[in-house]
Each structure stands twice: as C-alpha cells, then as structure tokens.
Swiss-Prot record:
It holds the Pfam family Guanylate_cyc. Residues 120-132, 1585-1597 have a biased composition (Basic and acidic residues). Optimum pH is around 6. Residues 292-380 form the Ras-associating domain. Residues 995-1275 form the PPM-type phosphatase domain. The gene is cyr1. This is Adenylate cyclase. It is found in: Cytoplasm. LRR repeats lie at residues 430-450, 454-474, 477-498, 503-524, 526-547, 549-570, 572-594, 596-617, 618-639, 660-681, 684-705, 707-729, 730-751, 753-774, 783-805, 807-827, 831-852, 855-876, 878-899, 901-922, 930-951. GO terms for biological process: adenylate cyclase-activating glucose-activated G protein-coupled receptor signaling pathway; cAMP biosynthetic process; intracellular signal transduction; negative regulation of induction of conjugation with cellular fusion; negative regulation of transcription by RNA polymerase II. Its cofactor is Mn(2+).
Amino acid sequence: MDQSKRLLKSAVPNPPEHFKTGISWLDDLDEKDDDSATSVNYDIPEITEANLCNDSHEALSPCTQPVGNSGRPVEAFKTYPSTPAVPSKSVLFHFYEPDENFSLSDTGRTKSDTALAARESSEKSEVPRDTRSAGIKPYKENNSSNCAISKEAGLRRLIDKDRESFDKNLNQSFTNLTFPEPISDDSDSVEFQRDSLNNNWPASLEGSIHELPRNSDDDGIPASAAHILDLDYHRDSYDSPWKKFLPYPSILSDDSWKAPESWGTSLPTEAIPKQVFTTRFFARPSLGNRKKEFFLRVYRDDRTSVSFICPIGIQTHEVIKLLARLFFLPSSANFYLLLIQFNTERILLPHEQPCIIFERLLSLFGCKVTSDEEINEEDNYSVARLVFTTMDIGADVLRKFSEKKITANLDISRSNLEVIPVKIYPYAHELISLNVSHNLSLDLPLDFMERCVKLKRLDISNNLRSPRGKPITALRQLEVLNMSRNDIYELDPLIFSGLSRNSLKELNIANNKLFFLPHSTRYLVNLTYLDLSYNNFVTFPLIITELSQLETLNFSHNLLSQISSKIGSLVKLKHLYLQFNDLSNRLPQEIGLLKNLETIDLSYNAITNIASLSECPKLNSINVACNLLSFYEYSNPSATFIDFSFCPLTTIDPAFSYSNLVYFDISHAKLIGLKDSVIETLVNVETVKVNYNHFTSISDAISAMQNLKYLSCTNCEMSYVSPNLGKLKHLVHLDLHANNIKIFPEEVWQVSSLKVVNLSSNILEKIKLPVATSKKLTRTISQLKIMRTLSGNPVSSLSSQEFVMPTVEELYLVDNRLGNDCFTALEYFKCLKVLNLSYNYLTEIPSKFFQNFSDLKHLFVSGNELANLSISSTAQVLLETLYANGNRLSSFPKNEALSKSLRFLDISTNNLQNLAVEKAEKKSLTKLPQLEYLNLSGNTWFRFSEHEDTNFTKSYLKNLKFLSIMDLNTKFSNAPSDVLNHFIQRNSPQPNILRYGVCGYLSRSIPVISACELVVNNFLHPQSSLYCVLDSDISAGKNNRVLKFVYDNLASCLAHEINAADSSSEQICNALRRGFLRLNKKLGNVIHYDLRKSSEGDVDSNYVTTMNISEKGYSMDSSCLDIGVSIILVYVRDTRAFVANVGTSMAIMSTRNDSEPTTLSVMHDVYNRDEIRRIVDSCGFISGEIKSTTTRAIGRLSQFPGVQAVPYVNVQYLSELNEFIILANQEFWSVLSKRTVIDVVRANRHSPLLASTKLRDYAIAYGAEKNVLVVIVELNGLFEENSLNFNQLRGDEKTLAISEKNDNMSFVQDLPDDSSLARMNREVSPPKGCIAMVFTDIKNSTLLWERHPIAMRSAIKTHNTIMRRQLRATGGYEVKTEGDAFMVCFQTVPAALLWCFSVQLQLLSADWPNEIVESVQGRLVLGSKNEVLYRGLSVRIGVNYGVTVSELDPITRRMDYYGPVVNRTSRVVSVADGGQIAVSAEVVSVLNQLDSETMSSEKTNVNEMEVRALKQIGYIIHNLGEFKLKGLDTTEMISLVYPVQLQGRLERLIKSRSLGTPTALPETQTYTPVRSRSNSLRPMLARLSDSKSVHGEEGGSGKRSVSSLRNVSPSESTGGYEGCIFDDQQYQLLYELCERLEDHAAILHGFPEPPPCDTGLAAPVNQAEEYSLFYRLTLRIENTIYCVSQMLGHTG
C-alpha cells in the first residue's frame, strides 16, 4: 500500500554525551577535542533526510546545525523507512542548476553523499533511533525489499495514483517537526522564532516542492522525485526540460531562516541565473561539438583505470553514471569525479564537462587539439588525471589539524580543501592572518568570514577561481588581500563595496586576465599598495588616480600603450613599476607632479623621452633599460640607482650633478665616451658598467670617483687607460676584457683594495709594475709618470726590491701577446689565488715560479707552447685547478703535493702518453684522490698502462665526476655514462661522416654535473646524427636526477615518434615536437611513481604498467618537480638539419663568406614578450624553489602551465656553404657574443675539438661561473664530392696554424691592433694581376656630420666594423680608407660582389643610433611587400675589374694600387646612389661568363665556392646605359647589381624614373636564388636505393616503369585502393629527388627556381591519384632536362 514517508520529531533535543557518528576518524577527532576548553561542541544531526538537500543534491552538513535568522539552530530530524509515496502531477520537486561554488561538507564528503548514507541507513526496517553509530550499510543489502518502484515505467503508472493522499500525509509530516535547543557562540544571534517554521520550513531548502504545470511533459523526471523514489538522480537532471520553469510558490515557506554558506546551500530565489564571476575552465565550458568523440581515461582508488570513448560534451554526472555501469555498481550517488594535477585536486561539478576541461589542459601542455592522436593517447597521467572515488577528501586534512595547533597566523594552503575545516571555526574570531591559497575547490563561506572579526591578512591566491565579493565584504579589519593567479577576467564589484573597503591597505591582483577594474575600486580610500602586474590592461584605469593614499603601483607585464595624464593626482605615490608594457614616445609631463616618487621602473618599453622625471625631487631609483632613449640631458640629484642599459644613448649631459649616485649602468649603448664634467659629479658611485659602447679611452677625470668599487668596461674598442685609475683607493673589481689595450698603467697595481683584474682579449705585450722608493714607500702618480718618461729601462732591469707587491687575488690575462718575460713581473703577485695566462705566447715557465705562490689554487695556461710545467717534485704546490690543454706536454709533473690537492685537471690536446704522477708508475692513478674533473681528449698517443684497470674510475678515481676521453686511440671501458656519478665524454663508437668537438667546464663553486651532451651517430638512418646539449637549473648539493632521466630517455622518445612519421620535413618537425612532449609526460610518470613508492613502499606492477614506466627507478623526490632541463638539439638527416629547443640553450650556424652567424633557436625566458603573454593567457607563473627565468623546459612540472615543454622547431636545408653548427648552454651564451664564437671557431676550423676547448676557455676568462658546455658540429662531410677539397683546405689551415705558432713573434707583429680582428682569419695577401677593385662612400655623410655629429661618431664605428669583418670573412684586402670611404680589392669578381651584397644586407639590420634612423637621410623605407629597403646609413658602391699597378706604401706598410682601373672605379661609384652597387661593363662580362667552359676550367676550389654562394644569394643586373665619366675620354657602360632580397630597390628606382617618362626602360637580367640545399644528388639516391624495391600490383607479372605512366589514362577508382607502387616514404623520396634535380640544374646553370610546392607528399589513395602524381613528377624532371639542354645549346 502507498504510504508517505514519516518525518518524526526527535525525542532528545541534544545528542547523548558519548554520541558516536559511525565515522571513525570523525569520532576520534571529537574525542581529542573533549579536553579542549576553548572548543565549541556542535550538535550532530541524527539523520539527514535525502530530500532535505540543496539544489545540487548536497545534503546538510552533519557537523554543524542550521542557524536561522533569529540565531537559534534548527533541530535535527529523523525519518523511518516506509513504502515510498508517489507524488501527484500537481507537485514538482524543482531542481535548479547547481551552484558553481561547489563545496564539501565539514566531514570531507559532499552533502549529497551524507544524505545518501543517511537514507540508506534509514531504509532498514524498524531500526532503533540510537543505532545510528553502526555506520552506513551497503545499499545492495536491502535495495530489493525497500524500493517500491525501481523503473521509470512504474513511476509513470503510479504518478497519477493517490495524489491527494500524498499531499495530505506529507504536509502532516512537516507539521510535526521540532528542533533542539540552540548551541551557538554567535554573539550577534537573536531569539529564534519557533512558530516561523510551522508548515513552511522545507521551502527554505533548495530542493523545495513546487506545483507542476498541468500541461507538463512526463518524459522528464524531476531529480528530487527520482531521489526519493530510489532512482538514479543523475538521469536527465541537468538537461531536463524541468529546469526551464521558474519557481512556483512552495507548499511550505519561511523567509526568516537561511542556511549558512558553509553548508553550500542557498535560497531558491538566489538560484535564479544571474551574473557569474568565475574562471574560464572551472565554470561552464562551452559545449563545443558534442558529437566529437573523446578518449577518456579514468582511474580508481586502487590505481586501476578504465578507458572509453565518449562525446566530448559529456557532463560529469553522465560520466559518473557510465562509470557506475562499467564497474557494475548498484548506484552512482556516492561517487565523485576528481580532477588531480600533481598535489592539487578538485571535485568536478555535475554540470561541468570533463572532456573539454581535459582537452584544454592537454593543449596547455603542448598537445595539438586538432590531432586526435595527441589528445586521445593514454599516457596523460602526468598532465592530469580523473579519479572515480568515494573517499573522504577532507579526512587527511582534518587529521592533520587534530595534531596541529591553530595559531593566529593560520596557513592551510595546498590542502585540497573543499570547505573550511570544522576545527577552525572556534578559533575564527582569533585569526589575524589566513592563507588558503592553492585550494582549487575552496570557496570561503559567508558565515565563517563573519566570525573572522580580527582578520587582517587574507591570501586566496592560486585557487584558479574568481572570489565572491560577499564573504570578503564581511571582513571589517582586512588590511591585506592577495587574489593573484586566480584566472579572473572581471572582479566582483562587491569585493570593494563592503565593510573592508575602509581598512584595506594592500591589494594583489597580479597574474590574472583583467582588462579593467570595477567602479567600486574608488572606495578603497586607504589603499597604499596595488599590484596589477601580469594582466591584460590596455589602457590606464582612471579609477586608480582617485586612490589618493596609494604609495606602490605595479603595472608591469601588461599592454599599456600610454600613461594617463591624471597620474599626477597620486601625490603620495612612492614606487611605480611599468616594465614590459607597450609605452612609447615621451612620458607625460604630469609624472613630474609625483613629488614623493622614489622608484620607477620603465624597462622594456619604447620610451624616447623621460624629461618629466627630472621634476621628481625624491626619485632615487631609475630603471629605463631596453628603451629607445637617445639622449639624457636632465638630472635627478637624489638618484642612487640608474640603469640605462640597452638604450641607444649617444649623449649624457645632465644639468646637475649625480652626487648621490651609487649604481650606474649604461651598457650596450652608443656612447663614444662620457664628458669629464659628468664623471666629476659621480663622487659617490660604487658600481659603473659601460660595456659594449664605443669608448676609446678611460678619461683622467675618473679619479673623481673616489668610492668606486666595481668598474666594467668590456667590448668597447678601448685603447687607452688613464693612470689616474690608480687613485681609486676603494676599487675592488676591474674588468676591461675584449678591448685594444696595449699598455696597462702600472699605477693601477698599487691600489691596495684591488682583488680582481680581468684584462683578457687585449693586445698586452708586457706587464709593468710600480716602483717603490728605497724606504719601501710607494711613489706618487706624478713621480711614476716622470720615471716612465725619462727611463726607458724595462722592468726586468730594475732591482727587485724596488717593486710594490700587488694585492690582486684573481688575475685574468687570456688572449694577449705576452711572452716568457711576463713571469718576472708576475713573481711579485704574492696574493694570487687565480691566475689565467691561456692563449698567449709562453714557451716555458720558470722552475722557481711556483715556489713563491703559497695561496695559488687555480692555474690556467691553456693554448700556449709549453713543453713542460717545470714543477719540481719537492715544491709545495697546492693547486686545485690546473688547465694546461692545447700545449706540447709529453709528461705530467711528478709532484706528490700537487697530485693530492688537484680537483680539476685538463691536459687535453697535448702529447701525453700516460698519466704518471709519481716516479713509480705503478698505480699512479691512486695519487689523485680528490680529482673530480679529468680531460684527456686529443692526446692521440695516450695509452693506459697494462696494470691499470679499464674501469679505473671506480677503482682509483672514486671522486671523479667528469671524464673526457675524446679522440683517444686506446681501448676503454664501454660502461655507460652516469650523469649522477661519473659522466664520460667520448666519441661514439659508430663511424660518422660528420666530425664534432665537445668540451665542458665543471664549476669550481658548484661541482655538480648540470650540463651534458648527447651524441648519437647513425640515429635511425645511416646518414643521420643527433647532437644535443642538456642544461639543468640545479642548485648546490643536489644530484640532478631529472637531468639523468632526460639523458637516458631523450633518444628513445624521439626515435619512437620519428619512426612513426614519414621522411617529409613537416612530419619530422612534428615528430620532434611530439618527442619532447612524450619525454615530459614520461618524466611526470616517473616522479609520481617514485613519490608514491617512497610514501607507500612497494607499488604494484599494475601501477607501473598503467603509467608506462620502466622499473628502473631514479629515486626522485618532491624537489624534482621544481627542476627543469633546457635542451637544444640538432638532428642532421641527409642534407637537412632539424633544430629543436626548449629553454635557454641556443644554437647558431656559420656560413662561408658571411661574417654574421644564423641563429637557429629561440630563447624561452621571461624576457621574451611572446612567452610572457603565453604565461598570462594560460594563468601560469614562473617561481618556485629554483629561481630560474626559463619559461620552457623538460620538467618543472610544479609550474605547469607556466612552464611547458613545447619546443621551437625549424629545418635548415644545408649546402656546401654551411660550415658548422655550434650548440651551447645558457651560461656560455651569457658571457660570449655570437661574433666572438664564430671568429674563434673559424680560426680553428681544422679541429672541432680544439675549437670547442678554446671556446670553453674563453667563457671561463670572460666570467663564467656555472657549468659550461659547447658542441661544434662540422658540416663539410655531408657533401662527398667536395670532401677531398675540404680536407685539403683543412690540412692547409692546420699547417698554417702550426707555422704561425712556430714563428710566433713575427706573427704577433703582423697582427692588427684590434683584438676582435686578430681573432678572425688572417688577412689575405694583396691581390695581384687582374683584380676586382671596389670603392664605397656614404651618401649624405657631410650633412649627417653637421646635424648629428655625436651620433655619427657611433654610426661610423658600426659602419667600419661591418666593412672590416665582412672583408675577413670574404677574403678581401683593405687598401686604405679616406674619411668614411673604403678602397678594397678582391682577386675575383664573385668575391667582390659577395662582399658588396653582404655589406648592403647587414647595413639594414645594424644597430644604428636613433638620431640616424629618425633622420630623413636614414629613415626606414619599406617595399611593396613590407620588406626593409633602406634603414640607417646608405652606402654607394662601385666595382670595376682589370689589371692594376701595385706598390707597397713605406709609411703604412700596406699595398697601394694605381692605374686606369683604379681611376675608373672611383668614377663608377659616383654614378651609384645610396644603397646601389654600380658595376662596369667588365664586371658584367665576367658575370655572363661564369658558366662557360673556359671559366669552369679556370675555377679553383675557392672560386667555385664563391660562384655557388653568389648564385645561392641570387642577383639582378639592371643596365643603366652609357655615361660620360669625369676625366675619361670614352663613355662607360654602367649597370646596377642588386641581391634578390633587395629587388624592391630596383622596383622603386624603375617606378620613380617611369613617372612622366614614356620611353622604354633599359633591359634587366635576373638571376633568381636557388634553394639552400645540397647540390649533390648522392644522398637522395642513396636513400632511394636503401628503400625497398618497387613492386607491382598484386597479381601483376612485373614492375612498372615510371615513365610509362605518362600515357596511361587516369580513371577514377570506385573501390578502395589496396596498394601503391611505393609506400609513403618512397613517395617522399621521389618528391625530394625532383626538387634536388631542379636545384642542381639551377646552381650549375643559373636557371630560375620552379614555383614552390607542398612540403609533404603522402601516398595516393586510389589509382587515379597515383597516375596523376607520377605524371606531375615525370613532367617536372623532363622540363628540367629540357631547360638545361636549351641553356647548353643542345637542340632536338
């Protein structure tokens, strides 16, 4: 019989004294709290009925009692099981959309879970009231006996029965409700009105009862009704048509009571949809294409998983239902779906779409959403995972709180909270600081916040959800509010309109997505600190200008284009941060009204004028680095910190002094010097950096800087240092490397405080010391000047007792011109701890030299001509570091003290035969007990003794961490490298056509392996190689397990993806990207595995199999989540180089006849604007234990999605012109410029190992402190037909290098007085005979000198550097210069034109001063395709060819040229305009004959390379006609030659001359550039021959001819195509073969390049497509052959 449920009153108003809930951990918590005198006992409701729940089916919390508006708690109630009643059609259990602020109850379960547990327990027949402590029983034990109706059909049949009986019984049940007495500590509560609940109380709950419309459809079943009738309440609950009806008047209603927000409930009127402030993907993702299928994988608590395909728009409750059926569960009501990312987790709301959320996370990880393979692959455990669970989320948290003492400063961050724990409530009124950050599902309830009456600091950052304003407004004393990194698009206006608006002082809303601020921001009248960094502000919010008390404003990393003129109203502003915006032009004048401004940061903008800052009297810190300032003529007398670095400054002339300045940085500017008047005002400055300027000298006025401690003036072309530098008594660090200093004043050595001096890469020949008086008193500076003038005696001839002992501890003299006499002066440096004399001209070290240095710990003498180290066996030498590579050592010094103290030893590239460190060679290696770094590479005669174990690193050198044995002709153990313990650097045992060199530096301060290389020859293919540099951000004392993992698994992950792709360039690039992502996922799985294993012990095999990891453990801990690895790799395959990188490692490539390298990678750091915007858009962050600026890396998983592993990938098509590729880590590139790197490698191109070692040594000399690693890959071996020629050239270069060292003194005399040019290739001998003469001139130079004299001084230096560097690279001879004009000559016309083309192209990209670029003569001019045509100085060039008369100039000692050819060349250049290259008829004739047989027979190897390089660039010849040149009797035919990249200049010229001129224009010849690919077809033919042979169709008798397919008529195939002639890879090979044929013809015969085609080629899907494809390929080949035949004169 039908009967309604009975709701009876509780017999006892309060629970018994020893009441038990049946939940073990909760009962234990209550027992521990009994002894606490301050705790508040909350009543536990006896039974919570299932229908008494909110609109989200979240039951009332069993740990708190509902408190009405009157302040009294509501009594608990209980139900007894009975036959369920059937609702009538006039009644609707209305179900609202779930609240987005989904939360858990205080027990950790959802409220619906508690209600379900109570209902299941109550359905047992005749259960006594006090047996509730027995716990929750499984539903399946009594589901068959207690459920009256279990199917929808039954519900529809019974829905019309006993409607009136149901209403009557139900109303009677609610009438009998009573409630216990209140237990509340709320002082503001009022007397509770009991009569207000009569017959109306259930209406206050969001599962309230409403009338059902008569015409309603019966197909949709109300969720509340389904819940009461024991049906699955998830069915159609969120897509049901019932939702569209508005609330009807409830049967029972009471407006006097409202449930607290900590219950997660709300009134029905509040359930009406309204404006929502939530995050992008934690609110309601768009449905998208619901029909699209998505592969979803869900885990269970036991770590097993299930995978299935579902629609991408499926909602959470639907997934739960599906999982319940898959796991054969009777009900899904007690289950949740957790989204877990590392240590954070969140319960997905019923209406959310897990697939869309998961797809979004995968896209942030780097997967392509359009690729089903990447999105649907199973191995996504490390990105995020979904867990189907019933476990109590809050249980572990509350257990911790039971053991933790709650203080006034409470930190519950990273606790995965759903609600505020109950234990905190009694202490709420005592809290002063509350940190609830990193809790993704936590929403602060209003009732709890109302209790926090003393709260002053609230941190709700990193919760990835927009906070509601109402709870925050209840905080009356809130002073500090942190809402950073919450993915906020728009702030709730209520946040700033409540009680806290008057007390709030600090507000942090950084790292969100805000475009504007709400109008209520103006109410924050006492706000002093506002952080709006890392947002999307485009305009300056005017509301901020109304915050009159503001002292600190951070607007960095936004998109501001200008600053409001009303900013002057912020009269109390002290700190203003505006870096990394889009500010341009001048600052508003109103900034000068900020009289209290102390700090301003405007770096990384485009500001041109900061004159308004001079009006700020208290401004002490100014940072305008990386702007467009060209002059600064203002003053800030109170300034103590000024940073003008990376600004094109040409003038600094302040109106007032900088007497308070302490830090001054003007590096990377365009300054030619500082005025003495400016220097004299810097009386208190302590740090000065003027690197990368055009300083020629250090002025005598520097003596005014009496407090100077640090001076850095590097890469300035400086040749003179003032002796007054010796007057700086507080100078500690002096860095003058990479200049042209020939004489260093001896007065500097008498500065007693001087500790570090770096004079590397200068042209020093001697070291002079100051001379002391007989009374051992230092002479004055003036006396030293007189002595230096009157006496010409060298230092060695004076008495040793007259010299001052310098106090320098670190002395760097690398890359100078010092001889053996330098040791005489160095003997007086008794305090030396570091001495670096590498790359000088030393042949012998005095035998007694080491006896005087008791403190010397680190000695570097690499790159000299030392035959021995002259260390006696009895000398007490306690060196820790000894670098003696690149010498002629045949034996190691046998010194017992030395062998015991050595930690870092590099004796590579010598003539060593063994490593005997004592007289008895037996077990000699045991005498190196402290050795950590050993480099033996390049000792081709080295042999291990017979008694030495091949595995000696474990037997003898137990502390050894790094061993390099490259190019050793000896057998060695094949034990693999262990990055954690012993890393072995060796050549690959597999043969390879590419030579490479590797060298590394193990930091003395942090001797931990943080960088290593990975080289795999014959990687996947015989003609393929893989070269990688791995660099990690490891701190001291930590073993880099992440680096070891990447080293072990990188190659396998790449191989897995490349094998699955075809050979097209696009597919390989995509495979490299997928390989990086695969490696990062695998790393995450391993870290999870090791963390779980360390916390739980052994992990079952199912878990290992599920995450697809090997059983090899790396013992990773939680710190590994903050460690990342930067990778730069080059994958050379046939004649293509695929480059991929993440992080800050970088690669460059050198090309013959080009002085500038090509950058192959992208730096992923916080200085990259694109990376900053990506981080802001993904709501990521860059922080953590490892303070790194890297934005992409393998690892650093704790900072996802701010840090991702998506690489930058590109492909370079190689040719014979490409010389080498250089890969190195960040520390290497931070101290060495690209130009220096290219110059050093080119000078040592005969040996990549020697070049890499020299680069390592230069990095040490220039200031590298961390680990350094560099890899050089030589590319010449790719082209077999020219390998002999290249080997011969390398042999000649090596012979030349050896002869130069043998006759080093004469070689030194021939070097120029420019250290940068001296590093490059030696200047060619003066050309003779028929030569190409070139004249250059700068257009409008006189006018520019008149208008911008200071800027022109800097511009001329830039111009001269480009000219001279390109001359060395191309092989030209500089005859002389006259003003700004150059006269140079070349042996061949192609070399001359190569130089002209390169110069014109480099002038466009040069770093000119702003005054030049903004002038009319040097302004930017763009072409029709938006390409740069003119920018900066415009240079005209004239070229002529013929026989000249040469004679050596006795004054300059350079060859000079005379004769008619020279005169005609000077006239030809006058015909050209700025940016034009005018050539004579002789030059055009030579160009036309380049392909003739006569010219080909006369070509040399070098000439052939020049011709190929010229045709690769491409050029255009435009005939101007005949000209009568000044001083010449006959007319001259003049033509213009342009590189193809500057074709727009010719178009502009033709267009300007054709206006108003109908006459025909002269003829133009075009030589289009060919693609930069191999001219050799051998690699392609080899690849094609290695593929499987062509087969015929199934059932065919034989192979088909490709050419025969032309005459076959294509026909459409109706059925599926079962097979092709070739597979995908072979089709791609054929496609590339056609391209190589066309390139080959174009290079040899100058034929124009064919139209560009698709990058990839897949196999045809039917026979018609196959025939069409072969027809196109065959036609292209025949067209190429026909064109070549026509050009060669063949017909027929």
